Amino acid sequence: MDGADEFSLKRLDVRKAFDRAAWDYDAAAVLQREVSERLLERLELTTVTPLRVLDVGCGTGRPTRQLLERYPGAQLLGVDLAPNMLKVAGRRPWYAPWQKRAAFVCADAAALPFAEMSFDILYASLVLQWCEDLDATLLEWRRLLKPHGLLLFSTLGPDTLKELRAAWSEVDGYNHVNRFLDMHDIGDALIRAGFVEPVMDVEKMTLIYGDVRDLMRDLKRIGAHNVTAGRGRGLTGRKRLGALSQAYERWRRDGRLPASYEVVYGTAWAPKFMPTAALHRGER
């Protein structure tokens, strides 16, 4: 298996991975929380007063709550592919008082069960990297936005986990790290989907670990371990983990191992006027 097929994401595998991670997710999702916070800060640069907001990939509901607080006059819908994530979100103490303004729906980010032009803001933090068809996903998101609605998203760029990818390449021929898209490719896809005025920037972030096992454990706890079709089957044995640890040692500095993340932040707008027929044809 090679080429694009090697990196084909299996939606059922993605769902299972995040379902398993749901109960421990908040304790391990350090990077996810930080990225979401920084993405939310970008809303301060806009003057949108939304009536309806969609939080795609809401996970355990943390960003949904923050959006509710930011927009007290808005209705919020949180969507996630993993049912267990939504179970955790629905049990949050903060959720009960806000049930009239918020709801959670289990659905795929690329095939959402809502009418076109339903939302003023679509918020999606660290979701796009799990969507197999970028063009179809962005077209779906644009379909859901009202004229001049705002898309606000973050995702991961190709330098994410570059140390882990390089270390695994010395151990075997399997793909162990998901492929991440370049910022410019995402920008081109936004234009193809009919969005206007896309703005993106990149930020490099680094998490520090004592050893490779800690890194692998964290990735599993947040559901972000490899789910591509080209991954090696079976358990990652002690011998292979030992070889991985040895290969990773070249990056050790001051007794610690880095795990690099390239975070892409983006905003884009739905056109002020969009004929209904064009939404279905994917035209601008």
Name each model feature, range by range.
Residues 135-147:
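A short glycine-rich, Lys/Arg-flanked "PGG" loop and its adjoining helix->strand segment in the class I
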Residues 52-112:
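Class I SAM-dependent methyltransferase SAM/SAH-binding core
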Residues 1-24:
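N-terminal, positively charged/glycine-rich alpha-helical extensions of SAM-dependent methyltransferases
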Residues 216-284:
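C-terminal lobe and adjacent flexible extensions of AdoMet/dcAdoMet transferase-like proteins
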Residues 120-133:
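A short SAM/SAH-binding and catalytic strip from SAM-dependent methyltransferases
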Residues 148-214, 221-235:
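Conserved catalytic/acceptor-binding region of the Class I
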Residues 110-121:
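A short acidic, Gly/Pro-enriched loop at the edge of an enzyme's catalytic core
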Residues 30-51, 66:
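Conserved alpha-helix/loop element of class I SAM-dependent methyltransferases that forms part
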